[in-house]
Amino acid sequence: VPFMKKMEEQNMDVDFIPIHHYWNWYADEGAQAFLDLVDETWKMYHKPIWITEFAISGDPGKTKFQRKVVMRYMKKVIAGLDKRDYVERYAWFSFSPTDYKNGGSGLLNHYEGKITDLGYLYQKLGMPKGYDRNNPVKAKANPKEDVIKKYYITVK
């Protein structure tokens, strides 16, 4: 909040509010708590929300039960995000399925180059409102100095 207060004091604004969050591996309570966090963030700022990273953490995903819990969490959260007009973007953070702590959240097996069952589910579930499959974002490299000159601002 101090950052936002400084922005306001200098008559500046932001275009959106980013959220980056991970819940533990319980699905139902965690999914609702995450959606509540999104709602509270909206109520606080009344700005579009971009969820830069979300997933379940603390889950080795080594059992069939745990993988089902992760899938249930993903389904519930994405359905909830898609119902909220103020959520413009979201991205599941994909750990590798071989990651000791967070493997149950992996969308891609990096070693085999194969999409996981969770990856296929994510692909099917929906798209953030701001994403257009027909108009993918193309990144363009900028020299560091040009970026600094163009976008640097001082917040006192």
What is each residue range found by the language model?
Residues 1-3, 32-36, 67-77:
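Well-ordered, non-membrane alpha-helical segments in soluble/globular domains
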Residues 2-40, 44-60, 88, 92-95:
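Aromatic- and acid-rich polysaccharide-binding/catalytic face
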Residues 59-64, 68, 72, 76, ...:
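Aromatic-rich peripheral "rim/lid" segments of glycoside hydrolase catalytic domains that contact
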Residues 155-156:
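Short, solvent-exposed mixed-charge patches
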